[in-house]
Every structure is written in C-alpha cells, then in structure tokens.
Amino acid sequence: KQDDPAWAPIFEAYRPITAWLAAKRPDVLLFIHNDHVTSFFFDHYSAFTLGIGAEYAVADEGGGARALPPVRGHPALSAHLGAALMADEFDLSFFQHRPLDHGCFSPLSMMMPHDPWPAAIVPLQVGVLQFPIPTARRCYRLGQALRRAIESYPEDIGVAIVATGGLSHQVHGERAGFNNPAWDAQFLDLIESDPERLANMTHADYATRG
C-alpha cells in the first residue's frame, strides 16, 4: 500500500523514525501498546501487563497471521523492569507465550527490517478497551517510573521507548471515522512542552477531543 495515495503519508511519516533507529541501533525496544482483544480478554483484563517472554509471535487476528518472523524478547530486562515497577508501587500483571497483534507488529514492521529483527522487544500492554481504565495521570507516572527503572538496569544496553496507537480516532459508534487533526497537533506539542496539562485531563476530556 506504499504507493496508494491514501496510505502514502503514513509510510512517509515513519521514515524519520526508521532512520533514527538505524542510526541509534538500540538493543531493546520497550513497546507500549494495547491489545485488540486478540491475546487479552475481558474475563481477566489488567491495567498494565508486562511481557517477560523470550520470544513473541505474530497473532492471527482472523485472517491468518502476517508473514513476519517472531521477535526476540529480553527476559532479563523484563525481570528488572517488573521488580523495579512493583517496588515503585505499580502492581503489574505479567505474560509470556502470548502472540502480539497489529498494535505491535504493524508499527514494528515499518520501523525496522525483519530478516531478522535487529532489536529485541519488551512489550507493555495497557488495558484501555474496557472501563475502568488508567487515568492520564497514572500513565504519566508510569512513564516516569519506567525511566527510573531503565536507568537503574545494571547492564550497559540501549533502550528505546515506543508508544504505539493512533491519535484521535473513532472506530465504532455514532462518531465512527471521526478524527481531530487540530487536537492531534496540539497533543504532540503538549506531550513535549507541557505533559502536566495532558496528565490533568480526564477520560471525558480525551473522548470529547477524539
């Protein structure tokens, strides 16, 4: 779809990210994402779920798994992050032997080559599909705790943090197809210049804006 005018801007936007990762060559990508009821279901749905596996396969989301190889995990870093975050009062769930869906593999496949993948990943699944869900403030504090945890890891490795997902979008309901480009641009500015303002917003604030 790279030559399709409707899709081309997406691929174009990934090129600086691809170039940055190729230059920095991180050992591990900490992949913050949400599962789309592919491997995590509402009968046991956690706010924050950390992957601790040695490998993650591509999930079959109904039409067969994409032709991508599994990606390596980093169990040692996962164990350290899990212990550090629990000590920092984040009560996590943990998983292994569960495939990852397009929330991980779609951006990953556009950010780097896959034969083989040049970096391992540590996936962190955020449960945002079923209320109650974490507040923006809670997610901001988790990000701060993740930085402390990564910086305290004793091995000298490069870690890049990837946060996936769309900005404003509505995939079902009365506003299906809605997006808000002006809010998207403002959000991207604020996440760098004034994250406290974003952290103070409510779920209703975010839902209204998209």
Question: Model regions: which residues?
Answer:
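Secretory-pathway/luminal and periplasmic proteins that interact with or process carbohydrate-rich
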Residues: 169-173
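Beta-strand elements within well-structured catalytic alpha/beta cores of enzymes
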Residues: 27-33, 124, 157-165
